[in-house]
C-alpha cells in the first residue's frame, strides 16, 4: 500500500521540489500552447479530436493550497459555449443601434461585463467581432507563452502580464470590422490583378497569359464583330458563332478551313501587329488556328519545315510515329521542324529529354550540319 506524503518538501528538499514543479509547469504550458496552435488535432493515445478549452491557468491565478499536501489551488471557471451566431436580418433591430462612442460601464469587481448576443447587437457590434477578438486574444496568449523565456524571474513576468493584458483589450475593443473587411477585399483584388495581368480593353475580363487574352479577343469580340458585318451585308450564309471549345470549320472536301488571323497578335497575313510588317500565317491542320512564325517563336528552319507537312499546334500535337496524343508529358519536339515524338517511340528509346537542342532523324538527313542540334546531339 502506497504511503501518502503529507509534506513533499521535506522528502525532496525545498529548492529541488520548486524547480521540478516549475519545469513541469513550463513544459505543460508549452505543450498546451503548441497543441492550441495546431488545433483541432486527433490525440493518438485516446483517439479523441481535441478542441481548445479554458481549463489552462496562469501563474497569477494561483492560490494557496487548502488540503494537506496541496501546493496550489486555482479558481473555478464556468463553462461557456462559443458563440458563432450571425446577427439577424430584421431591420427593426438596426434602428436601435447606439453610437460607437458610447461604451458600457465596467462592473465594480474590475472585470468587463459578459455581454449577451442582444447587447452586442444593440451596441452595433456583431457577434463575430467578439469571437474574432477572443480568438485573437487566445492566439496572442499562446505566442506569449511560446516566446517566454524559462529563466525569467517570476516577479518580472507578472509585471509583463499586467502591462500586456490592458493593451490587448484596448486593441481588440477599438478594432473596426468594416476596415478589416475592406482591407481583405483590397488585398484579394490586388492579388487577382497580380495573378491576371492581361486585361481585355472591351469587357475588362482578366487572364493569366497573353494567349488566353488573344483567344478571348478572337472568339468573343472578333466573332461578334464578324457576325454584325455579315448581317449588314445580308449574305446568304448565317454568321458562325464560335463557342469556347473552338469547333473547327470544315470545307466541302472535309479539310479544316484555317483562320485568317493570328491567335496571338490578332493580325492577318498582311500585317503582324507586333512587328508592323506583313508575315505569312502558319495554320494548324487539326483545329485551323493560325499564328505568325515570329509570334510562335519559330526559327528559320521551323518556318520552312512546317510548310512541308500538316503542322499541329501545341494543343493538337501528337506523336508522328504512333499518331496518338497520349502521354503528352513524354512528347519531345524537334527544334527544326516542330514535329512531336514520344520518347519511348524513338529508336532507340530515350528515358529523359536531352539537354540543349534536339533534332529528329528527318531533319538530320535533310539539314545535316545545319541542324539545330549539330554538335549537341550524338
Curated annotation (Swiss-Prot):
Effect of residue 363 to R: Abolishes binding to acetylated histones H3 and H4
Molecular function (Gene Ontology), one example: zinc ion binding
Zinc finger (PHD-type): 259-319, 316-366
Compartment(s) where it occurs, according to its Swiss-Prot or TrEMBL record: Nucleus
Listed Acidic residues bias regions: 148-163
InterPro entries linked: DPF1-3_N (IPR025750), Znf_C2H2_sf (IPR036236), Znf_C2H2_type (IPR013087), Znf_FYVE_PHD (IPR011011), Znf_PHD (IPR001965), Znf_PHD-finger (IPR019787), Znf_RING/FYVE/PHD (IPR013083)
Keyword ATP-binding on entry: no
Keywords: Activator, Chromatin regulator, Isopeptide bond, Metal-binding, Myogenesis, Neurogenesis, Nucleus, Phosphoprotein, Repeat, Repressor, Transcription, Transcription regulation, Ubl conjugation, Zinc, Zinc-finger
Domain notes: The PHD-type zinc fingers mediate the binding to acetylated histones.
Name of the protein: Zinc finger protein DPF3
Organism: Homo sapiens (Human)
Gene: DPF3
Amino acid at each position: 500500500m502506497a504511503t501518502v506524503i503529507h509534506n513533499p518538501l521535506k522528502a525532496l528538499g525545498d529548492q529541488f521540489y520548486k524547480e521540478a514543479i516549475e519545469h513541469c509547469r513550463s513544459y505543460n504550458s508549452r505543450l498546451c500552447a503548441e497543441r492550441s496552435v495546431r488545433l483541432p488535432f486527433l490525440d493518438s493515445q485516446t483517439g479523441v479530436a481535441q478542441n481548445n478549452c479554458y481549463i489552462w491557468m496562469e501563474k497569477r491565478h494561483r492560490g494557496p493550497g487548502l488540503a494537506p499536501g496541496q501546493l496550489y489551488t486555482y479558481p473555478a471557471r464556468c463553462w461557456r459555449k462559443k458563440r458563432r451566431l450571425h446577427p439577424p436580418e430584421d431591420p427593426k433591430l438596426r434602428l436601435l443601434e447606439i453610437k460607437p462612442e458610447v461604451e458600457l460601464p465596467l462592473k465594480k469587481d474590475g472585470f468587463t461585463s459578459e455581454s449577451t448576443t442582444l447587447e452586442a447587437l444593440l451596441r452595433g457590434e456583431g457577434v463575430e467581432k467578439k469571437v474574432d477578438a477572443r480568438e485573437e486574444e487566445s492566439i496572442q496568449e499562446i505566442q506569449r507563452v511560446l516566446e517566454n523565456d524559462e529563466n525569467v524571474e517570476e516577479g518580472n513576468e507578472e509585471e509583463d502580464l499586467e502591462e500586456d493584458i490592458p493593451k490587448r483589450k484596448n486593441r481588440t475593443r477599438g478594432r473596426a470590422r468594416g476596415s478589416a473587411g475592406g482591407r481583405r477585399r483590397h488585398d484579394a483584388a490586388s492579388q487577382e490583378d497580380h495573378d491576371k495581368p492581361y486585361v481585355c480593353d472591351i469587357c475588362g475580363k482578366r487572364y493569366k497569359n497573353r494567349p488566353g487574352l488573344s483567344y478571348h479577343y478572337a472568339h468573343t469580340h472578333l466573332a461578334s464583330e464578324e457576325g454584325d458585318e455579315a448581317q449588314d451585308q445580308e449574305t446568304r450564309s448565317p454568321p458562325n458563332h464560335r463557342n469556347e471549345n473552338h469547333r473547327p470549320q470544315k470545307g466541302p472536301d472535309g479539310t479544316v478551313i484555317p483562320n485568317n488571323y493570328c491567335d496571338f497578335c490578332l493580325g492577318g497575313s498582311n500585317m503582324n501587329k507586333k512587328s508592323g510588317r506583313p508575315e505569312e500565317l502558319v495554320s494548324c491542320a487539326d483545329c485551323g488556328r493560325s499564328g505568325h512564325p515570329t509570334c510562335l517563336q519559330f526559327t528559320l528552319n521551323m518556318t520552312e519545315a512546317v510548310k512541308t507537312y500538316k503542322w499541329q499546334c501545341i494543343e493538337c500535337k501528337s506523336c508522328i510515329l504512333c499518331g496518338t496524343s497520349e502521354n503528352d508529358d513524354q512528347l519531345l519536339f524537334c527544334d527544326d521542324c516542330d514535329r512531336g515524338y514520344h520518347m519511348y517511340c524513338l529508336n532507340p528509346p530515350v528515358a529523359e529529354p536531352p539537354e540543349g537542342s534536339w533534332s529528329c532523324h528527318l531533319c538530320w538527313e535533310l539539314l545535316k550540319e545545319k541542324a539545330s542540334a549539330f554538335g549537341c546531339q550524338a
